């Protein structure tokens, strides 16, 4: 209150739009002013267009800056039509012409978007399409492998040299070795794996190639095969020699690209091969990539998932044998019959791994003795073959095999094994002639087999044959079976299985061996569009966090430092809130080591604020900060350090989250919530329809932290007809007080951006309803089509509190300046008409004066209440008010300490 202040009245208090002026003893209005750290208040800086023209005069929904791995600063603006545009010039530079090129196409009915950054990748969500991701430039690759084979390259290679660490560090002495890399026809290539889709890979060469050769590239296509890149340009070529210099290999983004699994990694795979063998000393020290904006995909984490169960059907006994996925008996499956191996999986798959362990399907066994194989005529009993090395079983011979015998005198025949031990093979009586210590050759050959793979599609079984690859040679060795994604697969509870799952089956065209037992692991794939449109996103503890509109109260916590992996044990779906209400998640806020989640407010119960804690997906838990308050949209919050609190007004370390709800402006410390907007309560008073925030326009409000002035700036869409923000508030954090702004251009969103030049590291920019982006806190005018003066005024209410005020003179002190004036005016006893208006200079009287004093007469002897309004509304000028005093007829201060 005024009477308890020092003799001079300070202006650092706050405006009050709720209390009747006659009841106030302090400020009622404080418009377009900012508190100064050293005392006093100064008119806010102006705002100026970042670009000179706009191709579409529509509202800017949101504004955000993205800094990629290469340090490139990119300012993006989201327009009302849903498109996203990239600034041609980074702040503070201005652009002649339009703001910048379109980065993401328009789509109707988007909300104010959310954007976050994880490991240099941008994540974007606007509520009307899937989440989008963008790697920017100079993003590190996730895999770099060199393959030099001697036979046909399998779909999932098992050999190769991994140079990922060498090309992703800063050392030039650690390199990827491409020495004498040969052609693809000779089974040579190098492979690059990226987390997000790439359209350019830049290689830094240490030892360059000088041999004439060209480069070709392939990507993994949705049909389950490699496809040639379109529009490939080789920036590493020098004088006809690829890899002859450092440079970028670029190509056109294919629309049919999907992730792939190579060398134990799952991601986007790019295979490169040369047309001729290159030099014997060629090496690469770094590989980085660039990509474009692409829809986010849920990429498999690379950990094979076990099959749920298997059922083996045998025609000879007309029944199914049930097994767990880790031990499946496929012995004696007959060729050409209806013997099938069925297996189920919770997720659709594009491949499965058959692990044969020590019990493969034996398709070939051969030995040649060294004068140590003998043939025994068993008389009336079984004949048999003996081998002194006693390795028949370990070499793959077993009962039931047809064995071809050669290199003998009398036994060059084909026999069928009845029983096999380590040193004997028994056959039917009368087949063998006695021979001793021969160097005979015994061969069992069942090679050349294939198997048929089918998938359940709802109406029946559908064969998968195109691009089917079997690296197991019909389960004779461990390996992958891969195929294109079966888009028509349907789930079923196969043959009474308790699991509703996808079902696949395969059969062999040759009889399997007697003791074949396998396990099956699967290669799943996922469709992120099953979750609906991407509504908002965030990051937490190095993980991407997603919210969708299909399951609004559920969030997806992704794999650690994987931008696009939301499956496997290191990821987790998690329900926020406390009671299952389907309120949409609108904002994620990192708060210390925790994650604060805001949901929308709707119905009688309102919204919810959840605090998620934990070190990983296994230790995660939640607590409820509020089960009634929520947030209006994803651009209506700010996290601020060093906030004074009522319990500790001098605190310099308190962290607070400021946010707008339909109930007002609040701040939370993660434990409780405090409403701070009471002095501006008319904007949240539903009985005041002319001033209250407008229902149905919640997405138009905004809140952000002004790092220059250490204040919270707010835009509200109020009244009955406004369609964009039309009221702007300022919360002065240091004093916990309020002010208002009147803006020459309707700012609809705000962002702090890192400056590309100049002495100020952080600048403030805002998007406006006219389609322009404005720099804030700059100059003295609001410069749009024409300059508009910053109309700054402060109104001080002085109440006698039951006493008459005997004030004859208003003494005002201003910071001295080279030009400018201040206009005081007075109103008495609650009258809203100001009078005694006069204009006084703020320029210096005497050289080196630091402030200017002006005395204004008060033409009223005694009064109950005085309203003093100090105004400045001149283009090209600012006003800096220090303090004021009221003097009586004797020149003494009316207010005593």
Residue ranges and their predicted role:
Residues 1-97, 131, 139, 162-165, ...:
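N-terminal beta-propeller domains
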Residues 103-109, 221-267, 272-309, 313, ...:
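Small/polar beta-strand repeat architecture
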Residues 112-138:
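Hydrophobic or amphipathic alpha-helical targeting/insertion segments
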Residues 138-197, 299-435:
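Autoprocessing Asn-cyclization modules and mimics
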Residues 139-151, 274-308, 445, 508-533, ...:
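Exposed low-complexity, polar/acidic, P/S/T/G-rich flexible segments that act as propeptides
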Residues 195-209, 217, 347-368, 447, ...:
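A short beta-strand element within beta-rich, extracytoplasmic domains
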Residues 567-579, 625, 680-695:
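Surface-exposed loop and turn segments in beta-propeller and other repeat-based domains
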